[in-house]
Curated annotation (Swiss-Prot):
It is found in: Host membrane; Virion. It is a single-pass membrane protein. Glycans are attached at N29, N65. Its main location: host cell. Keywords: Glycoprotein, Host membrane, Membrane, Transmembrane, Transmembrane helix, Virion. This is Uncharacterized protein B117L. It comes from the Viruses. The chain crosses the membrane at residues 71-91. GO terms for cellular component: host cell membrane; membrane; virion component. Belongs to the asfivirus B117L family.
Amino acid sequence: MGYTIQLDKDGDYCWDEDPTHHDPYMQANATSHVATSYATTSHAAVAAPHAAAHHTFHEPFIKLNLTDKNIFNGLGFILIVIFIYLLLITLQQMLTRHIYNTVQHCVKAHLDSKNLQ
């Protein structure tokens, strides 16, 4: 059983049962949560806010389905991180080579000036 979070324009949210998805982890988690809620509070105290929350969500502003898993979600981010990493390595190598050549040129000029004296 899947669940959907709906967030309205005021920032309030509620859990909505989604009968099209069957996720045993979510079902077990929800069952234990409900069992804990019923064990600690009365049935009416739990059911009343839950029913009231469902009636307030006619037009959700953001709807996030927690059971949809897409393998390509993080692929673009990973490729961008790899590209930036390679770019930084290239820039570091170019800077190192430039500093090395500059120091080598300065040392050579210094030794040549000492030899001329």
